[in-house]
């Protein structure tokens, strides 16, 4: 039987080659950490829709990991249920105190799963500064420097 190949504009690839280039947990978790940080600062800035967007993107990264690294699927599902869903509820309720408490529990949950997986040397730490490459506040307050808002 012929080996199944995918055709791209750059050539053909085997299914095994496609499997080999899937992101590992380190790359996925880098995205997760970034989205967790953005979620926090968007909520803190009062941009609840943006906080929900970032948390949804974090969950999308979890879905990718469940497919590409299935041995982590149960832990990712449990983390989502125990830690991310309460954050979503706080975002939905636009409740900063509930959000902050749930977010901190999520940090502890991250520590737990890193310890469980034998990588206790990995610890998420919320950056002290708001990420500067994306506006995190309410959209109606956004103003580009040197540009007058129309209307």
Features from the language model and the residues they span:
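C-terminal-biased regions
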Residues: 1-151
